[in-house]
């Protein structure tokens, strides 16, 4: 925990989790672990920790854009992400974790790290 009582999770730690998950897909095949929701949330957390805004197009490594759009809509309905239209590209928008989701993910990843350690 930090001095403020908040769990510490770094962008590098989140990126490491993403690399492991992608390696798992390479070994076991793409279709076996096909639900992209967790990977979307991890990508958005990594972007937030790096103080970057990310667009739907930038998430295309996670899943095809049509699949991403459906999942982003579901995550937005659940209050886990927020969306902001891109005024320069009407076919793209910025996506970010809600503050509550970011806090919950950091708490989860911090507790998971302590369980593994």
Regions found by a protein language model. Name each.
Residues 76-87:
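A short, conserved structural fragment
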Residues 62-78:
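Short amphipathic alpha-helical interaction segments
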Residues 43-47:
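Short amphipathic alpha-helical elements of helix-turn-helix/winged-helix folds
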């Amino acid at each position: 925990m930090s001095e403020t009582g908040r769990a510490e999770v770094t962008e590098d730690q989140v990126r490491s989790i993403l690399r492991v998950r992608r390696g798992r897909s390479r070994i076991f095949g793409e279709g076996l672990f096909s639900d992209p929701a967790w990977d979307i949330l991890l990508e958005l957390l990594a972007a937030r920790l790096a103080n970057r805004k990310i667009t739907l197009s930038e998430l295309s490594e996670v899943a095809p854009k049509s699949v991403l759009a459906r999942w982003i809509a579901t995550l937005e309905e659940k209050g886990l992400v927020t969306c902001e239209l891109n005024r320069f590209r009407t076919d793209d928008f910025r996506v970010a974790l809600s503050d509550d989701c970011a806090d919950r993910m950091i708490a989860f990843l911090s507790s998971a790290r302590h369980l593994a350690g």
